[in-house]
Structure formats: C-alpha cells, structure tokens
C-alpha cells in the first residue's frame, strides 16, 4: 500500500502553513472514518481537502468514486502523480467554498479533515447540497465539534448548534489527539458523523428567514432573547411570555423545536 504521507514528507519536508495543513497519519483512525461512511463499490465520495491522499486511498481501494476538492496546487500535482492509475478518482483544483452542485455527483457522501479556521464556513456551505447528501464525516477542532453537537443550557450551545441540528442528525465518532497528525497539532480533534434530516421548512425563502432569526438570537450571547430581537419584532416580550412563560429567556435556553415554534408564532 502506498504510504502517501511519508512520500510527501520525504519529498517536501513540510506542509503549507497558509492552508493550515495537518494530515492524519494514524491508519486505524483513517479506516474508522472510511467505515463510518459505509463505503463500498460505486459509492460516491466528495472529499474536501484530501491533502496527500491517505484517506482518499482508503476510499479508492474500496471501489468508491472519489471527487477530491483541493485548493493547494502542490497537493493537486502530488495526487495526480501518485494516484493517476485510479480511474475512479476526479480531482478538482478549487476552493470548496466556490463549488457548485453541477460539479458534483447527483448523490454522494462528504468526507474531510476540515481546516480549523474554515470549518464552520465549510459546514454551512454543505447545507446547500443537503438534498444530494447520503452522509458526511468531518473532523473538527474538538472545541468546534462540541459547539456543533451541543444541547440547550450548556456553554457550547450557539447558533451553529441549532442550524447544524436543523439540517442533520449528528453523532460523535471519536476524539483524536494531536499526536496522530503530521505535523502534530496543539489541539485535539473530533470526528462527527452527519445524517441529513428532513427539513422542516420546504420553502427556501422561509427557511433562510428562519436561519437568519436563529443567528440574530445569538448575536450577543449575554443578552436576553428579547434584547437581541427587539429591533426586528415589536411584540417580542409578549410572545416570549406566551411561548416560554419567560420574557427574559436567553437563546441558549431554547431548543431547535422551540426556535421553530418561535419563528412560526412571529412570521406565520
């Protein structure tokens, strides 16, 4: 089996700090990620940031068709040189944030070790492909993963928790210590499995309005919900009293279902 990370390290000696590159080198964890996606012959995988291809190779050897989206030209060239004999691999040299639906298969699963500084943006971008997704397995900085998977009345609960859980059922696969990467990371990571949920709002304009309301609800976390929304909703204090029996309730106390109820009471 090709030891792609070792080959890359021997050839280049370092990763590109501009892209915050840290490659997972623990083979057991790579296998665990591939297994979480239930990859088999003919599965379509869209890998965001394949790096030097260690996880990509796991997918290819299982017979999956992999569309790898990589922004770093050096890594694109490296993958093309060492994986050229796999006809089930397509490499797109671009920033994933620029990718459109027409560039990807009609149905697929996402995978990726996401750059820490862009992971939230990338996760939100995946919601644009919601109807095409079977599953997603992503690695995040541990603290970010905790916010994504947080529940109400905890310090990590935020708009990213509500919106992520609106689109997906989320399951924690495992934590991974920084020593399992090259170069080693100073922080730990967490692997999450996402399974698309049926979207409550089928009208995209209504859905976008709901998501915007959720973001505004958390804009100043120390403030009560009525203070965060009072500029948009004149009767917010009475509505909160009616729905939650608490006109001073904070956003972090409200569940996804509660936010949906609040939106419907205000706007419909």
How would you label these PLM feature ranges?
Residues 196, 214-268:
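C-terminal lobe and adjacent flexible extensions of AdoMet/dcAdoMet transferase-like proteins
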